[in-house]
Amino acid sequence: MFSCQSLYKFSHSFRKRIPVMFQRAQQKSSLLHTQNESSHQPSLNKLGGFSSASLNFNSSRSSTNDDQQTFSSQSDNLPSSPITLPAKRGRSAASLKQLDNTVGFDVSKPSLPVFENSGLGSKYSTEIANGVYIDENDFDDDLLLENDIDQKPIPWSSSPIEHTKLTKSMLSSEKRSKNHLSKIYEDHTSEKGASSVISSNITRQGIKRSRTLPWAVDPYRYGDPDPKRTSTSADISQHTVSNDSSNKLSNGRSSSLDSLAKKRMSKSKSTPQISKKFSVPLNSASKSPIGSSLFKTSDSRKKSVPSIFLSDEQKRILDMVVEQQHSIFFTGSAGTGKSVLLRKIIEVLKSKYRKQSDRVAVTASTGLAACNIGGVTLHSFAGVGLARESVDLLVSKIKKNKKCVNRWLRTRVLIIDEVSMVDAELMDKLEEVARVIRKDSKPFGGIQLVLTGDFFQLPPVPENGKESKFCFESQTWKSALDFTIGLTHVFRQKDEEFVKMLNELRLGKLSDESVRKFKVLNRTIEYEDGLLPTELFPTRYEVERSNDMRMQQINQNPVTFTAIDSGTVRDKEFRDRLLQGCMAPATLVLKVNAQVMLIKNIDDQLVNGSLGKVIGFIDDETYQMEKKDAEMQGRNAFEYDSLDISPFDLPDVKQKKYKLIAMRKASSTAIKWPLVRFKLPNGGERTIVVQRETWNIELPNGEVQASRSQIPLILAYAISIHKAQGQTLDRVKVDLGRVFEKGQAYVALSRATTQEGLQVLNFSPAKVMAHPKVVQFYKQLASVNGLPIRNENKAPVQMRGVKNK
């Protein structure tokens, strides 16, 4: 009945364990016989044997209380010349060699039970005392085996997974012996999803490796049968089954999930998996276990990247750029989402040209703006330097640089941010250079333009005291652009009254009511958390002086963080020039209690412009230990204002700080990072360990000309109005007596989100200046209320011949 011809397929390590298994079986079989003599027959799942065809009795299980299995009538006969296996067998080489030559096993009595329906009679139904019993230790490593389901199953295995695999021949065999399968409708699986009896067109799915013992998964598998199960129920299959009749049992009955299995499955699905990483709650509240969350910036960014949601007018512009391929200029007042929309346009265009990344050139008029969007300056892209030469000389200069020529030839879309600071002369020169280099007579050589900026903000830098012309005054503006669009919905300020005041300030036409309201904002604002408003100055000198003065007032040791600069540009002087506009400084000096500003988005709560205070410097190991200790004690990690011990600290706080100091000393060689407590817009707090981030100056082909790795923090006591352009600040202090340029007052005051967070000193309507040409240019946009204005001087898009390949 059982043959061992396929024993050679076993692994060497598995064969070594077989003698031990039989030795253990001999010792336990007598005890098993004594215990079960007056009760039901033991489960066939506890018995072992060899079959050259299959173990189809292992693929399902009876629901009756005796938990018996029925053999197929197609089973092989017993071996004609069995050999006797000694009760005690060593692991000698001779013994293994004898085992390899074995064609069957005989233990003096029938080693396997034969039941009534097997066709072999019932006289052996009680003679199972010497049957082979498989101990749970034999299952230790079998579940790690991975076998192909399409291959013929091995004759016998201690792994329950092997008993579930049926081939086409097994199914046909079961169909011919249908009368013997009336009690075998349940499969031989656990609740984690093993295999039902399925058809030959089964789709193989990788077996999940596990060391879990089968009876630890299903208590009814190797003991008494589950009384809740019926003969028509079957566990859900782990394999993928087609939608046809392949999910039917071979006897024609449908495989269904019984109520207990459903309960188990739903429980396993609903139970959350505990992550080893620290999860960051987003509903932070002040001084609460959730509100004072602690995490590393690198972890948080992977978990929660700020999502970009576009308004209808923003979606319309995105469609005009990506789908309709129009050359456009979109603008809007401060806080209308120009930067958000531009980042989305860049993201979608790069995805569209992902196989040809150099087709999209991302540039900006200034190094700061270019660094913020991951691009390069317009001058660097064009290869024109200061562009003071004639067009012919510029073309000759560009042709000497093969990389620069290739950029011009490969570019399909040219993006220019902060175009308001590009003068008309430079724009016209670049347009002619593009036509000459690309040998294309179409405007800008057939390149699609995406321009954005606000001409009411900072104007082009005048050269040699000569006032520069605005970009919209250039000939290129009239010939190359299809549409001009103005964004109207303000996101930054929710107060309609404040929005109205800022719009009047932008146009340079303030009403008496607005003047009165701005003058009221000269009061001093006191904040309970001790964080000061950020002062905006028109010059870098004033910014450095203010920050230095504040830092000298802090009686703490300074900690210096030096940026790590790299890139394809080897000339340090040139690379430093490229990184000069980067928001991250080359050298950052911090102290405990220093006020800082985050200059990169971390998640939906901690964004560019968030204010915080340095409460200490710790290494990553100390951070992890303190976090775990706080979780175990049910408290907030780093719930104190400083890691240094103060005479005013309570005893329990001192004890925690002493422990922290000990941990820091134990890892004194590790790098210490700033530990910063940030203030959230909703009034809550978040304490994070801030580590290095990277800013790239990147060419369209992906080449990183310059890169800076630095802590994403700056001192927040003061920043320049120029660097504040594009920022959103909750607390702002501005002295308008210092402004000297048109648009500076508007840029500075429009950084604030509310009137409550804005302090204005020396306000005077005379300081509110808007250029008459800019006012006239925007009158057209105001008249159409955000609708696109077509450039009638521009040729239709299809005539430009810019098509996707």
Swiss-Prot record:
- GO BP term (any one): replication fork reversal
Keyword terms, alphabetized: ATP-binding, DNA damage, DNA recombination, DNA repair, DNA-binding, Helicase, Hydrolase, Isomerase, Mitochondrion, Nucleotide-binding, Nucleus, Phosphoprotein, Transit peptide
A UniProt-annotated Pfam family:
PIF1
Write down what this protein is called. ATP-dependent DNA helicase pfh1
Which terms in the Gene Ontology molecular function aspect does this entry carry? 5'-3' DNA helicase activity; 5'-3' DNA/RNA helicase activity; ATP binding; ATP hydrolysis activity; ATP-dependent protein-DNA complex displacement activity; DNA/DNA annealing activity; flap-structured DNA binding; G-quadruplex DNA binding
- Record text on subunit structure and interactions: Monomer.
Q: InterPro entries from the entry?
A: AAA+_ATPase, DNA_helicase_pif1-like_DEAD, P-loop_NTPase, Pif1-like_2B_dom, PIF1_helicase, PIF1_RRM3_pfh1
Listed Low complexity bias regions: 245-257
Functional summary from the UniProt entry:
DNA-dependent ATPase and 5'-3' DNA helicase required for the maintenance of both mitochondrial and nuclear genome stability. Involved in the maintenance of mitochondrial (mtDNA). Required for both repair of mitochondrial DNA and recognition of a recombinogenic signal characterized by a 26-bp palindromic at sequence in the ery region of mitochondrial DNA. May have a general role in chromosomal replication by affecting Okazaki fragment maturation. Required for the completion of S-phase.
Q: Quick one: where's region Disordered? A: 58-91, 217-282
Which cofactor(s) are needed, names only? Mg(2+)
Q: Which SMART domains match?
A: AAA
Q: Where is the transit peptide?
A: 1-25
Binding residues for ATP: G332, S333, A334, G335, T336, G337, K338, S339
Q: What is its EC number?
A: 5.6.2.3
- Answer yes or no on keyword Methyltransferase: no
Taxonomic superkingdom: Eukaryota
Which residue intervals are the DNA-binding region? 744-763
The family this protein is said to belong to: Belongs to the helicase family. PIF1 subfamily.
Among the entry's GO cellular component annotations, what is one?
nucleus
What does changing G508E do? In pfh1-R23; cold sensitive for growth, suppresses a temperature-sensitive allele of cdc24
PTM annotation (Phosphoserine): residues: S80, S81
Give, from the UniProt record, the effect of changing M1A.
In pfh1-m1; localizes exclusively to nucleus, loss of mitochondrial function
Reaction catalysis annotation: Couples ATP hydrolysis with the unwinding of duplex DNA at the replication fork by translocating in the 5'-3' direction. This creates two antiparallel DNA single strands (ssDNA). The leading ssDNA polymer is the template for DNA polymerase III holoenzyme which synthesizes a continuous strand; ATP + H2O = ADP + phosphate + H(+)
Q: Which CDD domains match?
A: DEXSc_Pif1_like, SF1_C_RecD
Which residue windows does the record flag with biased composition (Polar residues)?
A: 66-83, 230-244, 268-282
